[in-house]
Amino acid sequence: MHHKTGRKLSLVGWSLGGVFALYGAHQLPECVRSVITLGSPISVDPEGSASPPLVKAMYRLIAHPMGPHAHSMQPRASKLRGRATLPMPLSCLYSISDGIVPPQEATVEGDPDLHENIRVPGSHIGLGFNAVVLWIVADRLSQPEGHWRRFEPSGPLGHAYRMLTHRLQAGQHGRNNCRPNRR
């Protein structure tokens, strides 16, 4: 697309797709405008992953159909994290109730002027269909190139988002997050 239009691309990746997006951005930074990851294991230490054993086995299982070198993508993305940071905006969306990718593996440290971690509600499988996630992705993609700003929602939606993430931070997440508190 970049070669056809001359415009930079925004890469959005969900789960392992975020690992591929991050890797692509490192390989061709001149073609990439921004990267958005959704519950992606971008900070995994393959030797001591906090992922459950079943999830580790799943990564190994799905790596084979992707090709002989697919298993190396996750460690490479993790190593890339320690090198020079991406020269473009990076928004990492993660959930404390993901169930597949632990929050510490779906977030990144980097340049606070270009990189951010955004907590969202929901499960790993639901991230691609979650209205809050889609709203945030649309917000990130709507920013003009060269004028990136951190996600700081305002208005009624911003208030609702802050209330929701405050509940998550307070530990009121998981299966009961849609039920009223009963005391």
Identify the residue ranges that each predicted region occupies.
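Serine-dependent carboxylesterase/thioesterase catalytic core
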Residues: 1-84, 100
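C-terminal catalytic-base region of ester-bond hydrolases, centering on the histidine
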Residues: 86-183
